[in-house]
Swiss-Prot record:
It is found in: Target cell membrane; Secreted. Changing residue 11 to K: Severe reduction of antimicrobial activity. Loss of hemolytic activity. This is Panurgin 1. It comes from Panurgus calcaratus. Antimicrobial peptide active against Gram-positive bacteria M.luteus (MIC=1.5 uM), B.subtilis (MIC=1.3 uM) and S.aureus (MIC=10.6 uM), against Gram-negative bacteria E.coli (MIC=3.7 uM) and P.aeruginosa (MIC=51.7 uM) as well as against yeast C.albicans (MIC=7.3 uM). Has weak hemolytic activity against human erythrocytes. Probably acts by disrupting membranes of target cells. The lineage of its organism: Eukaryota, Metazoa, Ecdysozoa, Arthropoda, Hexapoda. Keywords: Amidation, Antibiotic, Antimicrobial, Cytolysis, Fungicide, Hemolysis, Membrane, Secreted, Target cell membrane, Target membrane. GO terms for cellular component: extracellular region; membrane; other organism cell membrane. Changing residue 3 to K: Virtually complete loss of antimicrobial and hemolytic activity.
Amino acid sequence: LNWGAILKHIIK
């Protein structure tokens, strides 16, 4: 999974 994009989506 692309955690960089996921975390950026969760932590705005």
